[in-house]
From Swiss-Prot:
It comes from Streptococcus sanguinis (strain SK36). Homodimer. The N-terminal domain probably binds unfolded/aggregated proteins; the C-terminal domain interacts with ClpC. Enables the recognition and targeting of unfolded and aggregated proteins to the ClpC protease or to other proteins involved in proteolysis. GO terms for molecular function: protein-macromolecule adaptor activity. Belongs to the MecA family. This is Adapter protein MecA.
């Protein structure tokens, strides 16, 4: 189990599925509030070294966020006692003033006083909701980063350099493998082909083999696609190799 303090009023406890099983708990136990669940919460609180400001707090509220391999438990402290009495409502008007209030006015005054007493609880709940939202955003960003990394590994860009358009057209005639995207640029009196290949499903050494095959008829270049896009002149878009294959080499 891991514990992380998110704010003065909220901590997050991460419990792995193995820890749940050791304690005789299942995911389904958290779907419906029950005495077994509450006992489990307070048991893990006893096991963990709680922050000092949580030890003497009043009520504790728990919110569970199930994950595929773990459970996140958000614990929010409250300073509002379970049994709110009129002695706690010291800011209520005196009895003489209360006697002149209509029932509606009295209820509004009582509601206002209770709201003031429970304001910290409301702020704690808002803090908890903010923490959950930030965690969801972080997880979403991590998933996006992972997807981006996977895409980067799946696709490979090759940049090839040719002295003239005739050499580029001659190279295009040799292409007998699948290309997902290709562009032809002119930059500094030379011609450049950018070739995007999807290598998913191919052997690990396929990208190196493909580069060696390309270098039989072209020179690979250190110039990046970004440089070509910014400083080069785009001649053929998207399917440049196919376009060059239609050029008759004299």
């Amino acid at each position: 189990m891991e514990m992380k303090q998110i704010s003065d009023s909220t901590i997050k406890i991460t419990i792995q599925l193995e820890d749940l099983e050791k304690r005789g708990m299942e995911m389904a136990d958290f779907l419906v509030p029950q005495e077994k669940t509450e006992e489990f919460f307070y048991t893990i609180l006893d096991e963990l070294e709680m922050p000092d400001n949580f030890l003497d707090s009043g009520m504790l509220s728990f919110r569970v966020t199930p994950k595929p391999d773990k459970v996140d438990v958000f614990v929010t402290k409250s300073k509002l006692d379970k049994n709110l009495s009129f002695e706690d409502l010291a800011d209520l008007p005196d009895m003489d003033e209360l006697s002149h209030m209509s029932p509606d006015e009295f209820l509004k005054t009582l509601e206002k006083s209770i709201f003031e007493k429970s304001k910290e609880d409301i702020e704690a709940v808002k803090s908890l909701e903010t923490a959950e939202a930030e965690e969801r955003e972080q997880l979403s960003q991590e998933a996006a980063d992972e997807q981006s990394a996977e895409n980067a590994e799946r696709y490979i860009y090759y940049i090839l350099r040719f002295e003239d358009i005739k050499a580029a057209a001659a190279f295009a005639q040799t292409v007998d493998y699948k290309i997902d995207l290709s562009e032809l640029y002119k930059y500094d009196s030379a011609y450049y082909l950018t070739i995007l290949v999807d290598v998913e499903g191919f052997p690990e050494r396929y990208p190196a083999w493909l580069l060696a095959k390309m270098r039989e008829f072209a020179d690979d270049s250190d110039i990046t696609r970004a440089v070509l896009q910014e400083h080069g002149h785009l001649l053929l878009v998207t399917d440049a190799v196919s376009g060059l294959q239609k050029v008759e080499c004299l």
